[in-house]
Amino acid sequence: MIRQRTLKEIVKTTGVGLHSGRKVTLTLRPAAANTGIIYRRTDVNPPVDFPADPASVRDTMLCTALVNDEGVRISTVEHLNAALAGMGIDNIIVEVDAPEIPIMDGSASPFVYLLQQAGIETQNVPKRFIRIKKPVRFEDGDKWAEFVPFNGFRMDFEIEFNHPAIESDEQRLLFDFSSQGFVREISRARTFGFMRDIEYLQSQNLVLGGSFDNAIVLDDYRILNEEGLRFDNEFVTHKLLDAIGDLYMCGHAIIGEFRAFKSGHGLNNQLLRAVLADQEAWEWTTFEEEEGSPVAFAQPNMVLA
C-alpha cells in the first residue's frame, strides 16, 4: 500500500522572518501516523499548536497565516507547506520560536533540502488522498480558481502582469505533479515584489526582512537583482508553488486538476474550503499498490537534485 510518511530525524535551521526581520529558529520533528501537519509556536507559554487546516488560515494579505481564536499566529507557512506537499510528508511537527516561518531564499528549495537531510520514514498506515469528484469553482472579480476531476494532480495556472520584465508568453504554466518534478521545476522559484510596494510596507514596519537575498525585486521597468531570474517563467512558477502550499493546508494530497487565473493565497484558500464543505465534491481514497497511485512521490531513500 501507499503509506503515510514522516521524518526519520529531527532537523533544525535558522533564518530571517520576512515581516519582523528577526532571527527565527525552525525545528522539524517526526510525528506519529495520523498526526497530520502541526505548526507550533514555542516562544509562547504554553506552546500553541495550529493543525494544517483551511479553517486555520485567517489572514492572506501578504502571505498565508494561521491564526487561532486568541489571535496567536504563524505567518508565511506556504513555502514550507509546499515542500511538505512535494515530498509527500503526512505527519510532522513544525516548531518556530517566532510568529513566522523564516523566509530563507524566498523559495521552497531550502525546505526541501532540510527534509532530505532529515530523511523520510514510511509508516505502516495507508496514506489518505482527497479525490475530486465534481467541478468546484470560486471567483473574485476577474480572478478565479477551480478543481475538476482528474486521475492525477495537474495544475494549470495563469498570471497577468503588464510589466516589461515579465514576458507575456511566460505567464501560464501547466504542471503534472510529482516529487521529482516539484523539486526540479518548481521548488526553486522565488517570491517577487515591486520596490515601491516594499518601500511602503517597510515604512509601515512590514516585510522588514525582505531583501534581494529572498525575493525577486522589480521597479517599473526591470528586475533589480544582479543575478536575474533562475528560469524564464519564475514568476508564474512561484505563484504555482504558493498554490501547492496553500492547497496542502488540507494536509492531504489531492487527486484532481487545479486551474486558476490570477489566483492568490486568499482565493486558493476559499476554493479549498468550498471543496471540503461540499460532501459530494470529494471522497477519501487509499491505494493498495504503489503502481496504482496517480500521484508520483519520491522513494523515501531517494535524494532529488
Swiss-Prot record:
This protein's record includes keyword Glycoprotein: no
Binding site for Zn(2+): H79, H238, D242
Obligatory cofactor(s): Zn(2+)
Enzyme class, UniProt record, top EC level: hydrolase
GO cellular component, one term: membrane
Active site (catalytic residues): H265 (proton donor)
Catalytic activity reported: a UDP-3-O-[(3R)-3-hydroxyacyl]-N-acetyl-alpha-D-glucosamine + H2O = a UDP-3-O-[(3R)-3-hydroxyacyl]-alpha-D-glucosamine + acetate
Keyword Repressor: no
Pfam families: LpxC
GO molecular function: metal ion binding; UDP-3-O-acyl-N-acetylglucosamine deacetylase activity
EC number in record: 3.5.1.108
Entry similarity comment: Belongs to the LpxC family.
Protein name from the UniProt record: UDP-3-O-acyl-N-acetylglucosamine deacetylase
Species, as recorded: Vibrio campbellii (strain ATCC BAA-1116)
Species classification: Bacteria, Pseudomonadati, Pseudomonadota, Gammaproteobacteria, Vibrionales
